[in-house]
Amino acid sequence: SYFFFYFTSNYLIILLLFTTIWNFYLAKAISNSKNKVKRKYILIINLVGSLGLLGLFKYADFGIEQFNNLAHHVGLSEIPYLNLILPIGISFYTFQALSYTIDVYRGKLTPSKSFMEFAFFVAFFPQLVAGPILRANDFLPQLREKMNISATSLRQALIHNSNLKLGVTIMAFGFMKKMFIADNIAPLVNEVFKFPIGYDSFTIIIATIAFGIQIYADFSGYTDIAIGAALILGFKIPANFNKP
């Protein structure tokens, strides 16, 4: 998972590592504290740190743009853009790690004793880019089961994995949705939306409906690819449109 992330995001892998460490130890601190007020403060610190980092990379330049537009009208000096590169999967691994910490805070989950186990959960590569977001109480038991068997047994389980055929089939449907539906609809929709004044109302309505189909096929396709890849590895992750 970390190799995949480093290959696509290079040094921004530091953010994934920070999010993992941040949530792992703050969840432990929440679990170890019996003081309700302290637990709440730790959770707030976690939320501010995690969401603040996400907001910085996703919305900093948007905020600067709005400020500069206002500054231009009132005669204030504009501030330079940060031009931050958006790390791949930052929304998904941020919310996935937060869901773990919040579940610990609510008493629904006992914090993981193993940092490697938690890191694997946060960075599980099939769904790192486009989800679906995993819940720790669904995923960690599967991981622990596989960690408690020998390497030989694990290899045999993967070879004779009854979900292998199903996983490949789901991935194939995902690629079909993405490549044959979403990618072929996109140019047509973009052409209409780029110059809507040149088209009649009926065409614009059809393009709007087609855009909805494009978004569904694109997102659903990525999700199916993730679910299928996870099944091939022996993990079951939730259907995103049933458990968003």
Language-model segments: which ranges?
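Membrane-embedded transmembrane alpha-helical bundles that form the catalytic cores
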Residues: 1-244
